[in-house]
Amino acid sequence: MTENEIRDLLFNNHKEDLHTLIIQMREPLALPQDTFPSIAQLLQNRTETKINAMVENLETLRLDGKEVRLVRDSDTTTRIDLLGSIADSGDLVIIELKKSGQTERQAFTELLGYANHFCTLFPPLSESSLQSILIAPMEGRGVRDALAQELIINEKNALALIPKIVGEKIELEAYYPSELYYRWVENNVLDDSSMTVVTASFPIIEGWIDAGE
């Protein structure tokens, strides 16, 4: 099944029920009850909760267009694979589809660019009202790193779904960043180079500080 066939299948057959194709969602990481959670655990819980919330929002998604052209001043015509809206909130959903793992990193970069472009076209629109979805194998380290960066650090509404072709049908597996990414962020936050310690000394001021304590 080619990219165009997948796009047409989603638009023609799942215009209002794309969420039913999503599989293998997971429960967010449970935080420890007897100890204070680590930074990595807090980030993983928050991110996985956000991913699940974005998937749940798709229950009222309606796909409104395919190969939607973006008007630009250059000769190159840019098209969005699928464009939709969420009935409950009115948020826009931009979907980019790449079947090949070789081009998925570029596709994700373009997807983020489309979101910025919409905000430029409609100044009252903010990125919090946009949801960007990449349907791709998520095989490359580059695209996995980029998605983790946007989700964990930049707090973007970005979601990745891995297509699973079964005959003439398709399933979309929800992608969750590996716990290694959260550990990496934690290690960088707590790294010595990320911290600055300042000490200050001053003479005792009568009546201000009790020097006897």
Named regions from a protein language model:
Residues 1-213:
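Charged, terminal alpha-helix-loop-beta segments
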